[in-house]
Amino acid sequence: MYKEPFQPTYEYALECDKHDELKDFQTEFYKKEGTIYLDGNSLGLLSKRAEKSLLTLLDSWKEYGIDGWTEGEHPWFFLSEKLGELTAPLIGALPEETIVTGSTTTNIHQVIATFYEPKGIRTKILADELTFPSDIYALQSQIRLKGLDPDEHLVRVKSRDGRTLSEDDIIQAMTDDIALILLPSVLYRSGQILDMKRLTAEAHERGIHIGFDLCHSIGSIPHHFKEWDVDFAIWCNYKYLNAGPGGVAGLYVNKKHFNRLPGLSGWFSSRKDKQFDMEHTLTAADHAGAYQIGTPHVLSTAPLIGSLEIFKEAGIERLREKSLHITRFMLNLIAHELSDFGFTIGNPLEDEKRGGHIYLEHAEAARICKALKANGVIPDFRAPNGVRLAPVALYNTYEEVWQSVMILKKIMKDEEYKQFENKREVVA
């Protein structure tokens, strides 16, 4: 599919673009002329199909009013379940195990409220010190709601190098006092992929439920939840899945747990045929839909309809193949062109351990990101010293990768970054 061996040349980049089996999808996305967008790991670009599905649902409100809940091409009442079914193949789950609902953080609250049952000596939640802050805030909150002290009952696995986690260290921390585990599938800074299959097996061997935050993996790498037997997972849909800013998130619950009453319930937790009976006793849905709480955010869900159509056509395996190849090309270019400018590659180099973005460390990272933006390259900065660059398989080209590295080289060689302040913007 892609030309081998790797060559750090412009001609090689053009040759790879020529043989890219996914190149036709690039025209599906709105790409600003004169800009190289490498921030799809933070917010994916708008596709024409996502725009169309948003306008379609807006029109259904215009045409049907209240009857839009049951009429039209995409009846709102069943939309969360329908999109869950379309998402399920991306994580290797059954359709009934997946639901589009809430936000990442509210869904963390939901699964922790459901699965965290401190009893006897098992009172602690295991996480890690490199995970996204919102995960930690939610875990601390849920521990407090049980009347416990997060300082004592939230265990965070330490990183050996400040970038990655050792799976051996995580397993060693699965002690007899651990009641529940929540880990990232891919670390948001370094892009390290954790071995979810191994960690799940080790947790279950010790009688511990385990779940994963998929925000930086879904839509970028394949998952095999049916095989791995993961207990639960949560994710956002606005990064690699291109559902738009504030797009409604996703939640997975293994079918073996369908007999559990959701920790947080609302009327959309109901079985559909019972919901409008308005009874004060909840008859929970017998699928992941039970983990919904309130009325779905229809217009914030709508873009995902068109986006998931694209993923179905492209295929997650093909997307991963290109992602690995184009990130390897970028890594090789960085090693070849930027070795004299003080950069450290902070993500794993092994394909099986590397997610969809490149993570560069530099003492001047914040001002380098500003200089890149001034030159038409959109990265993002992560404190304290990280530059993230995500060549997304659906819409980025090898030519763009080559151009972005050359622009970065010029910025460093000419010290253009020095005209900017070395601190982050309000939104990094």
Curated annotation (Swiss-Prot):
This protein's pathway: Amino-acid degradation; L-kynurenine degradation; L-alanine and anthranilate from L-kynurenine: step 1/1; Cofactor biosynthesis; NAD(+) biosynthesis; quinolinate from L-kynurenine: step 2/3
Residues with N6-(pyridoxal phosphate)lysine modification: K239
Keyword Hydrolase in annotation: yes
Lineage top rank: taxon: Bacteria
Enzyme Commission identifier(s): 3.7.1.3
Keywords on record: Hydrolase, Pyridine nucleotide biosynthesis, Pyridoxal phosphate
Reactions mediated catalytically: L-kynurenine + H2O = anthranilate + L-alanine + H(+); 3-hydroxy-L-kynurenine + H2O = 3-hydroxyanthranilate + L-alanine + H(+)
Keyword Cytoplasm attached: no
Binding-site positions, pyridoxal 5'-phosphate: T104, T105, F132, P133, S134, D135, D213, H216, Y238, W267, T295
One GO MF term: pyridoxal phosphate binding
GO biological process, alphabetically ordered: anthranilate metabolic process; L-kynurenine catabolic process; L-tryptophan catabolic process to kynurenine; NAD biosynthetic process; quinolinate biosynthetic process
InterPro entries: Kynureninase (IPR010111), PyrdxlP-dep_Trfase (IPR015424), PyrdxlP-dep_Trfase_major (IPR015421), PyrdxlP-dep_Trfase_small (IPR015422)
Gene3D superfamilies from the UniProt entry: Aspartate Aminotransferase, domain 1, Type I PLP-dependent aspartate aminotransferase-like (Major domain)
Role according to the record: Catalyzes the cleavage of L-kynurenine (L-Kyn) and L-3-hydroxykynurenine (L-3OHKyn) into anthranilic acid (AA) and 3-hydroxyanthranilic acid (3-OHAA), respectively.
Cited HAMAP family: Kynureninase
Oligomer and partners: Homodimer.
Family membership noted in the UniProt record: Belongs to the kynureninase family.
Name of the protein described by the UniProt record: Kynureninase
Organism: Bacillus anthracis
